[in-house]
Structures are given as structure tokens and as C-alpha cells.
């Protein structure tokens, strides 16, 4: 088989139908995936179907199988799933090139990806280079972006070669430390950016004594940045129905227990005062049972008192109805109750 012209193949591979560029894999990705599968196929077929027996015979036979068309066919047949249209299309277009590399060029060009995807099809670039002309990434192809970031388009015919820095790094070559990080040498030529202490906005070392500037919510004290206790400020930063909790560099306002009128912390034991209907008992705000007080709160004749959380209600008993601000008997004592007559005290939900 005669390989097609590489320039034509490269053009066919790079052209994608209008409107589908975002849906299909890039030419470089398709090429790389095919090469990865081919390389895996070589691993899977290495010394296949041989093991034990006549070693001398095996070595002689294996040496023939290693570079044979039989082995190539086994590899090629396993490259693409039947349903993978993109893979099968690329394989159909480039199978002759793969055969040429396998039979004649493998020793001269042992790196299939470099020969097939970079040099021949021009679908990809070598690592550390980018774009149509495979230019060196920022910082050089050997160590793009100072080793602290990603080169946009690295290894492809796309991108602009600029650096997208890893966390903690900044600058066109990702060689500078961001605020909140300091330079920590690892060798004579390389250094890393390590995180400052949380108290520091800028720093030269890892502790709160190495701060150049303190973060918001921290102040310099005795040559170190220490947390500001905002909860101790006057006036207090939280609402009257809240209590303040100091956290590193800030504070949070939490709601008081519903039984409290002002509080110093969480729960009914932290109330400054109790709301109406509650009183301090054993160190916490407890509901007052108004119905059990010596001075009865329900003053109408025949009226029953029911305690509720923080209050009470006055209700006419079974067989009585409220009329003209009093409880009037509507059913003689002992008479059978009707559906309209209450037969039990109201529930808390009803109240």
C-alpha cells in the first residue's frame, strides 16, 4: 500500500464540519487517542500465545512475530469499537501510514506519537510547544510556565501559548507568588510558592510573625498578626436577639434561644433576661404556668384555664358556650354531647 500525501491527510484531519467544532474531539485529541490505543495494543500482543516449552524455538518464532503483519493486524483490529465513528474514520484514512511505520520506520522513529501526530499529520505539537507552527510555550518548551502553570495549547496546534498559573503563582511566566504566598526555595534554581499563615495578607515565611501585612480581621501585636475579637467591640456588632461568636479574622451572629430577651450564648441557659411568660428557674428560662398561680388569670364564671408556652388561654368548658363575655350553659350536666359541643380541652395546636 502507498501512503497518501501527508499534507492532504493533515488537511482532511484538521477540517471539521461547520458548527460541529465544539461537539467533536480536536484533531490532536483524536490522533493521540489512536496512538495510545496502538501502543496499548503492542503491550497486549507482546509475546502473545507463547509461554513455556522450547525456549529457543519461542525466541526464534517471537522475533519474527514481533515485527510481523500478523501482529500489526491484531493490533489494528483492536483499535476502535464498532460504534466509534470518529476512531474508525481516522483509522480508515491513516491505516497505510500506520502500516508504513510498523514495517519500515519504527526503528528510525520509535516514538509513534511524535512521528504520526506531530511530524506527519501535523495534528499535534511536541510537548512544550503550541499553535500552527508549534512555537515554544512561555518559559520555554523544556519547562513551560516555569513548571508552575499550564501552557494554553500545549502539545496541540491550538492555543496562544500563554500561561494559566497554578494556585499561588502569578505573572506571565508563573514565576511570582500571589498575595498570601511566599517563596520557598527547593534548589539553587527552583522555588515554590507556599501559603502564608491565615493571619497574613503578604508574608516572607510560614508563621504569623512573618507577615508583611495583616489580613482583614487581624492586627499587628508584639511583632505578630493576631485575631481581632470583634465581639468585644462597643457597641456590640450583633442584634439584641443575637449573640456574637468570634472566629479567626471575623465573627458570626447567631440567634438567641426563643425564650431569651438578649443572651450571651447558645441555649436557654445563656439568657440575659427571659421573655414575657418565662422566668429563670435553675439557671434557665422556664415557662410560667399561669393557670397554677394563686391569683387565677381566668375570671369569668365556669371558665377553664389552659397553659400555653409563654402564656395561657381561657376556654369555656364542655357544655358551655361563650355569650356576652361569659360562659353560658347550653347542655345540662350529664346530657350526651353533640358534635358541636367540645368534649375535651383544646390541644396546643388549636390554641
UniProtKB/Swiss-Prot annotation:
PROSITE patterns: ASX_HYDROXYL (PS00010), EGF_1 (PS00022), EGF_2 (PS01186), EGF_3 (PS50026), EGF_CA (PS01187). Residues 1-21 form the signal peptide. FU repeats lie at residues 190-237, 250-297. Its main location: endoplasmic reticulum. It comes from the Eukaryota. Coiled coil: none annotated. The keyword Transmembrane does not apply. InterPro entries: EGF-like_Ca-bd_dom (IPR001881), EGF-like_dom (IPR000742), EGF-type_Asp/Asn_hydroxyl_site (IPR000152), EGF_Ca-bd_CS (IPR018097), Furin_repeat (IPR006212), Growth_fac_rcpt_cys_sf (IPR009030), LE_dom (IPR002049), NOTCH1_EGF-like (IPR049883). Disulfide bonds join 28-31, 137-151, 145-163, 165-174, 260-263, 291-305, 298-314, 316-327. Its EC number is 5.3.4.1. Keywords: Calcium, Disulfide bond, EGF-like domain, Endoplasmic reticulum, Glycoprotein, Isomerase, Redox-active center, Repeat, Signal. Residues 133-175, 287-328 form the EGF-like domain. A motif (CXXC) lies at residues 28-31, 260-263. Residues 329-351 are annotated as: Disordered. One of its GO terms (cellular component) is endoplasmic reticulum. Interacts with CHRNA4. Component of a complex containing at least CRELD2, MANF, MATN3 and PDIA4. Belongs to the CRELD family. This is Protein disulfide isomerase CRELD2. The gene is CRELD2.
